[in-house]
Structures are given as structure tokens and as C-alpha cells.
From Swiss-Prot:
Location(s) in or outside the cell: Peroxisome
Molecular-function GO term, any one: enoyl-CoA hydratase activity
Primary localization class, coarse: other
Catalytic activity: a (3S)-3-hydroxyacyl-CoA = a (2E)-enoyl-CoA + H2O; a 4-saturated-(3S)-3-hydroxyacyl-CoA = a (3E)-enoyl-CoA + H2O
Family affiliation: Belongs to the enoyl-CoA hydratase/isomerase family.
Name used for this protein in its record: Enoyl-CoA hydratase AFT3-1
Pathway: Mycotoxin biosynthesis
GO cellular component, one term: peroxisome
Organism of this sequence: Alternaria alternata (Alternaria rot fungus)
Role played: Enoyl-CoA hydratase; part of the gene clusters that mediate the biosynthesis of the host-selective toxins (HSTs) AF-toxins responsible for Alternaria black spot of strawberry disease by the strawberry pathotype. AF-toxin I and III are valine derivatives of 2,3-dyhydroxy-isovaleric acid and 2-hydroxy-isovaleric acid respectively, while AF II is an isoleucine derivative of 2-hydroxy-valeric acid. These derivatives are bound to a 9,10-epoxy-8-hydroxy-9-methyl-decatrienoic acid (EDA) moiety.
InterPro entries: ClpP/crotonase-like_dom_sf (IPR029045), ECH/Chromodomain_protein (IPR051053), Enoyl-CoA_hydra/iso (IPR001753), Enoyl-CoA_hydra_C (IPR014748)
Amino acid sequence: MLNRFSYSSNAWHNLRVDGPDADGIAVIVLARSQSRNALTLPMLTDMVQLLSAMDADDSVKCIVFTGEGPFFCSGVDLTEGFGEIGKTRDTHRDAGGKLALAIHNCRKPTIAAINGTAVGVGITMTLPMSIRIAAKTAKISFPFVRRGIVADAASSFYLPRLIGYGRALHLFTTGALYPAESGLLHGLFSETVNAASSTLPRALEVARDIAVNASQVGVYLTRDLVYRSPRSPEQAHLLESAALYTRYQSRDFEEGVQSFLEKRKPRFQDTMREQSGEGVLDRGDCVVGLAFKPKL
């Protein structure tokens, strides 16, 4: 495990980090309100580093992202550009995509508290997150075609899976700005709140519920099952069975049952570090974090 340190004491570029608190909740704030929280390459790089550190830190149980001021994020800062372009098509890697993959690969649940307008990578960076909560006043846009480019941050993978191909194509094709409650965005947000000021408090409520009541390892494996499950129910059944086999032998399973029977809050002890050491979360096979592939 990494030695615990104060994330807030590090000189992150236009990011403020609060926590983790006593319940294990860390908050990453996009703190560039004078530029509507537009992202720079150093900010994107720092978030990737933060996610890597928090992923390995057992004291972090849930990560919440939000924006400073009235905006969540207005996308990439176009005055600074998109960073260095690779020497060839095969070597170029989208910086927003690197962040999206860092979020996807982070084993801790992530929540977007979208307190205001989110545009471009400002919204696509939230697609790999576990939960998105938005203010009803927020405006959302995927404006890539209006800038002469294409979707970024692996959003061509995530968005259709979240809201369906028809709505995703409409949003991508028009590049227009839509209110958070638009029918075109149906399914993108698990909750919307009336006031922008209520977005972060509600996200923290959800994060605390997860941190206090859910097994970290159980949450991670379940999310991996959702994203990596095969196409047939039979194959999904085999993978779920393999994952259940490992969890039935865990301390968290014993504690989950015992706390339910005793009508008390669970005190889960399994950590990512311990499970990784046993090979349960070995990503080598790329099959729901299991260290083996069941025979189909």
C-alpha cells in the first residue's frame, strides 16, 4: 500500500483535492473557474496521476469529481490546444482518452457531481464513472463535429452503451447544447437535482452510502462484470459463478452476512491490495479481474 499522504498538499495544476475523510471519500475539484474549468494538458496529466495513487491507496473508498463555480467543465482550453500530436496516426494518443481509461481502470467507485454546464471532454470524462449526478440547470454538449474533429475520451464506446445508439448519434451528429433533463440525455444521469448547490452534497451522500455499506472488492468486481461480461447469458453466468466462488471465501462475505443477521452496519476489511496479492484481481486475463478463465 502507498504510504498515506495529504493529497491536498501537492501542487496539482488547477485541481483541489479534499480528503480522503474518515469514511474514505476523496473529492477532486476542477479549480479553474476563471476559465470555466477548461482543462489543460497538465490538469489531465495530474488527474491520471491522482487516480493511480488513489487506486492503490486503501484509505480511499470513493472518489467524487466536481467543478468550482457555476461550471462543471467547458472542455479543453482551446487557447492552449490539445497537447502534442503524435508523430504518426498509430502513435498519437488522445489525452482525454488517457484520462477516461484511468477512470475506467481505477478500482474505486467514481462519481461525477455535475454542478453546471459540461461540454466536450468536460462531459466525456464522466462517462466511465460509476455514477453521474447533474444539476437540472446544467447544459450538456458533445460539440466535436462543430470543431471539425471526432468524439474523444473513448466516448464512442461509452455513450451508446449508456443511452443507446440512436440518442448517442443524435448528440454526436448535432453537437448542440441540451439541458440536462432533455430526453436525448435520458439514462446518462442517475439523478438530477434542482439546485446546482445541491449537486455535490447529494454526490457525497451517495459516496458515503457506498463507502460505509458496500464491500470495495465487491463493488469493483461487479462493475467489471457489467463492462466485461460476454454476449450470452450462459457466458455471463460462468463469469459470475467464478467471481462468486472467490467472494464466498472472503472475509467480506462472512461480514456481510453476519452484519445483516445482527442488524448492524458492516465492517468490511478486504482491500484491493490484499486481493491483488492473491491474484484475484489479476487483469492479465482481462476477465472481470479474475486470475483464470472459466471453460465455456
